[in-house]
């Protein structure tokens, strides 16, 4: 959960970071 990615204005970097964090499951 990043403040920049809070709401509909999500930065590509934040979205990519979340994907990477949830990837190693």
From Swiss-Prot:
Disulfide bonds: none annotated. Residues 1-25 form the Alpha-carbonic anhydrase domain. It comes from the Bacteria. PROSITE patterns: ALPHA_CA_2. Residues 1-25 are annotated as: Disordered. Has a potential use in the concrete technology for the development of an inherent and more durable concrete material. Its cofactor is Zn(2+). Belongs to the alpha-carbonic anhydrase family. Releases silica from silica-rich substances. This is Bioremediase. It comes from Thermoanaerobacter sp.
